[in-house]
Amino acid sequence: MAKEELLEMEGVVNEVLPDTRFRVTLENGVEVQAYASGKMRKHRIRILAGDKVSVELSPYDLTKARISFRHKDERPAGAPSQFRRR
């Protein structure tokens, strides 16, 4: 049996919730609750409020999503990073 087709959309993270969950507003205006994919957690990719992300939605439950990709910010090459390394 084949896997179901996932709906891929883009959105912006509005709020960081407890337990590595996020409230994301999709490009069509719908707000969903999303979680970071396993590979994003494994590689410690940080997701903050205001980040543009790609999400995958199941056709069976359109209120929950998985964040599959965080798009890079459009910053000039010489601009300082938001975080300092320790």
UniProtKB/Swiss-Prot annotation:
Quick one: where is this thing mainly located?
cytoplasm
Record keywords, A-Z: Cytoplasm, Initiation factor, Protein biosynthesis, RNA-binding, rRNA-binding
Write the signal peptide boundaries: none
Q: Which cell locations does it reside in?
A: Cytoplasm
GO MF term list: ribosome binding; rRNA binding; translation initiation factor activity
Asked if Ribonucleoprotein is a keyword of the record, the answer is no
**Pfam families xref list:** eIF-1a (PF01176)
Cite the SUPFAM superfamilies for this sequence: Nucleic acid-binding proteins
Q: S1-like domain: which residues?
A: 1-72
A GO CC annotation recorded here is: cytosol
Question: Is the keyword Cytoplasm assigned to this protein?
Answer: yes
Q: Which CDD domains does the entry mention?
A: S1_IF1
Residue runs in coiled coils: none
Q: Which SMART domains match?
A: S1 (SM00316)
Please give the subunit comment from the record: Component of the 30S ribosomal translation pre-initiation complex which assembles on the 30S ribosome in the order IF-2 and IF-3, IF-1 and N-formylmethionyl-tRNA(fMet); mRNA recruitment can occur at any time during PIC assembly.
Member of which family? Answer: Belongs to the IF-1 family.
Role this protein plays: One of the essential components for the initiation of protein synthesis. Stabilizes the binding of IF-2 and IF-3 on the 30S subunit to which N-formylmethionyl-tRNA(fMet) subsequently binds. Helps modulate mRNA selection, yielding the 30S pre-initiation complex (PIC). Upon addition of the 50S ribosomal subunit IF-1, IF-2 and IF-3 are released leaving the mature 70S translation initiation complex.
Task: Check the record and name the PANTHER family matching this protein.
Answer: TRANSLATION INITIATION FACTOR IF-1, CHLOROPLASTIC
- The protein depicted here goes by the name Translation initiation factor IF-1 2
Upper classification of the source organism reads:
Bacteria, Pseudomonadati, Pseudomonadota, Betaproteobacteria, Rhodocyclales
